[in-house]
């Protein structure tokens, strides 16, 4: 029975739960790695050993957080749980493939761990650039294991993307058009399209790297007519859409949370929100070389990538102001989920502003590979993606479990986390402007103060993570059951009660069209 339910599952709710648990578990591993980084950088001098070990930790931290925490939770967890419920589908289009998508992840995670355990580990950074990732600088199996790990995670995501696209297009009630689906469903659809188009390019790049390392091809070796910059183009053609893949489902969740706790029946500017997400998805594919301003591109090329990157600020601005307009005039309920959403809007905007700074190719020449970049992407990930995940979790926890969280503790948790992440990452802007480079385990004494403060912030965040575990435990032992949910007419996922029955929408939903 246990095996049939959890190992061979074809139920979107159970698979979503597996994704959430796996993502939470990986998130703990990723948090542990980040604390190793901040412990090393807490004061000048060496803590862990050499820079190879440090860079293995940094690389693992990135891969774990991106491929095993954010993506499984947002797309696998919330996506599986909510998309079928929101469109009134009985399950995903391909329920068994759905199960395989999940079960490819634990082996992938094990391969990544194995890569750290053999030889010297993969100290390449998450970008895995050759020649550092070649078989001279990284002899042994570490990088090869990392590449296999990425292959598995990539196959998992591609299959999941196919599944979501098919489900969303094909399994709506006959009367429901695409423009009547909730914004979270749209965000997952667009994310899935991005995954489907970008991951094969990554697969090609890392496969060529694999053959360069093991079969003496020279795709990225100038000695044989190759070019390491080709790898950078292939990697970032995936890598830039990837960062939008990480944030788009968050946009969808924030839209739902802000609408719900403003007491509105719909978000402000639904069509604008949809088109903005589609624009972001499209533009995300034509700006990749802004990660490569320092490799010696033509001035006209740099001018194009600078301006194209700045254009993304327009649809992003549409979304931010639409969220604010949704709040406007609403009967605002200061729930923990609303606090996460408001924190998201503010801090994501700050991260977006530093992104506009970095989009300027002239400035980026100076700021590239400094802590300014680290601060930028951690504002949009550690306070964008993670705040969206936390907001979505406390908002939909009653749906998933049938129990309510302790409101007061959840708010305290938010405050601690808010202080922690800001104290960790705000000082890194100063370090970057002062020229402290990324990916080094030690630094000149001049950088000590801000690094110490940053490391203190990371330990405050750790207390927040520990508190979150306690809050979830408290909810399950107290068993406060959900009595009633507001606004179910415009929030279809709550319609079947908390938690919903194992099978929902076994007969097609009746859709009442009102113009």
From Swiss-Prot:
Higher taxonomy: Eukaryota, Metazoa, Chordata, Craniata, Vertebrata
Subunit structure: Component of the cytochrome c oxidase (complex IV, CIV), a multisubunit enzyme composed of 14 subunits. The complex is composed of a catalytic core of 3 subunits MT-CO1, MT-CO2 and MT-CO3, encoded in the mitochondrial DNA, and 11 supernumerary subunits COX4I, COX5A, COX5B, COX6A, COX6B, COX6C, COX7A, COX7B, COX7C, COX8 and NDUFA4, which are encoded in the nuclear genome.
SUPFAM superfamilies, sorted: Cytochrome c oxidase subunit I-like
Identification of the protein by name: Cytochrome c oxidase subunit 1
Alphabetic keyword roster: Calcium, Copper, Electron transport, Heme, Iron, Magnesium, Membrane, Metal-binding, Mitochondrion, Mitochondrion inner membrane, Respiratory chain, Sodium, Translocase, Transmembrane, Transmembrane helix, Transport
Chain positions recorded as heme a3 binding sites: 376
Sequence positions that bind O2: 244
Keyword Transmembrane helix assigned: yes
Residues on Mitochondrial intermembrane side: 41-50, 118-140, 213-227, 287-298, 358-370, 434-446
Residues where Cu cation binds: 240, 290-291
Reactions the enzyme catalyzes: 4 Fe(II)-[cytochrome c] + O2 + 8 H(+)(in) = 4 Fe(III)-[cytochrome c] + 2 H2O + 4 H(+)(out)
Gene: MT-CO1
Ranges in the topological domain labelled Mitochondrial matrix: 1-11, 87-94, 171-182, 262-269, 328-335, 401-406, 479-515
Domain of life: Eukaryota
One Gene Ontology term of the molecular function aspect: metal ion binding
Amino-acid positions noted as binding Fe(II)-heme a in the UniProt annotation, renumbered to this chain: 61, 378
Annotated compartments: Mitochondrion inner membrane
Binding site for Na(+): 40, 45, 441
Family: Belongs to the heme-copper respiratory oxidase family.
Membrane-spanning residues: 12-40, 51-86, 95-117, 141-170, 183-212, 228-261, 270-286, 299-327, 336-357, 371-400, 407-433, 447-478
Enzyme category, top tier: translocase
Function: Component of the cytochrome c oxidase, the last enzyme in the mitochondrial electron transport chain which drives oxidative phosphorylation. The respiratory chain contains 3 multisubunit complexes succinate dehydrogenase (complex II, CII), ubiquinol-cytochrome c oxidoreductase (cytochrome b-c1 complex, complex III, CIII) and cytochrome c oxidase (complex IV, CIV), that cooperate to transfer electrons derived from NADH and succinate to molecular oxygen, creating an electrochemical gradient over the inner membrane that drives transmembrane transport and the ATP synthase.
EC number: 7.1.1.9
Membrane topology term: Multi-pass membrane protein
A cellular component annotation (GO) from this entry: respiratory chain complex IV
Ligand binding (Mg(2+)): 368-369
Matching CDD domains: Cyt_c_Oxidase_I (cd01663)
């Amino acid at each position: 029975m246990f095996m049939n339910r959890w190992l061979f599952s074809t139920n979107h709710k159970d698979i979503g739960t597996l994704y959430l648990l796996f993502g939470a578990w990986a998130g703990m591993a990723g948090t542990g790695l980040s604390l190793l980084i901040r412990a090393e950088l807490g004061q000048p001098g060496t803590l862990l050993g050499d820079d190879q070990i440090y860079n293995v930790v940094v690389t693992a931290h990135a891969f774990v957080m991106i491929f095993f925490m954010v993506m499984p939770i947002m797309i696998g967890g919330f996506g599986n749980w909510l998309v079928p419920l929101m469109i009134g589908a009985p399950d995903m289009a391909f329920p068994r493939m759905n199960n395989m998508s999940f079960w490819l992840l634990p082996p992938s995670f094990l391969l990544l761990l194995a890569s750290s355990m053999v030889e010297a580990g993969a100290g390449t950074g998450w970008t895995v650039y050759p020649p550092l990732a070649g078989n001279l600088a990284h002899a042994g199996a570490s990088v090869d294991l990392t590449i296999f790990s990425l292959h598995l995670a990539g196959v998992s995501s591609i299959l999941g993307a196919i599944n979501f696209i098919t489900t969303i297009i094909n399994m709506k009630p006959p009367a429901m058009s695409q423009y009547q689906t909730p914004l979270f469903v749209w965000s997952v659809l667009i994310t899935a399209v991005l995954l489907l188009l970008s991951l094969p390019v990554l697969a090609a790049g890392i496969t060529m790297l694999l053959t360069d390392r093991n079969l003496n091809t020279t795709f990225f070796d100038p000695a044989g007519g190759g070019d390491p910059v080709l790898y950078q183009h292939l990697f970032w053609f995936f890598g830039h859409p990837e960062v939008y893949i990480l944030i788009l489902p968050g946009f969808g969740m924030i839209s739902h949370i802000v609408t719900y706790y403003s007491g509105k029946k719909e978000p402000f500017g639904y069509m604008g929100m949809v088109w903005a997400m589609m624009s972001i998805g499209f533009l995300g594919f034509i700006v990749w070389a802004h990660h490569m301003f320092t490799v010696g591109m033509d001035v006209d090329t740099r001018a194009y990538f600078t301006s194209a990157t700045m254009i993304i600020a327009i649809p992003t601005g549409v979304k931010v102001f639409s969220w604010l307009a949704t709040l406007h005039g609403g009967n605002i309920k200061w729930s923990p989920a609303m606090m996460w959403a408001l924190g998201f809007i503010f801090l994501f905007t700050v991260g977006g502003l530093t992104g506009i700074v970095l989009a300027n190719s002239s400035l980026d020449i100076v700021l590239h590979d400094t802590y300014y970049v680290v601060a930028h992407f951690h504002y949009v990930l550690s306070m964008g993606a993670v705040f969206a995940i936390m907001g979505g979790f406390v908002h939909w926890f009653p749906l998933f479990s049938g129990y309510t969280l302790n409101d007061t503790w959840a708010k305290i948790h938010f405050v601690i986390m808010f202080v922690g992440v800001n104290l960790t990452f705000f000082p890194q802007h100063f370090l970057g402007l002062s020229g402290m480079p990324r990916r080094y385990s030690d630094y000149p004494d001049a950088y000590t103060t801000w690094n110490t403060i940053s490391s203190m912030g990371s330990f405050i965040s750790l207390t927040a993570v520990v508190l979150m575990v306690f809050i979830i435990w408290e909810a399950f032992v107290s068993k406060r059951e959900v009595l009633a949910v507001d606004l179910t007419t415009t929030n279809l996922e709550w319609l079947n009660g908390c938690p919903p029955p194992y099978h929902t929408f076994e007969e097609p939903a009746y859709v009442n069209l009102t113009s």
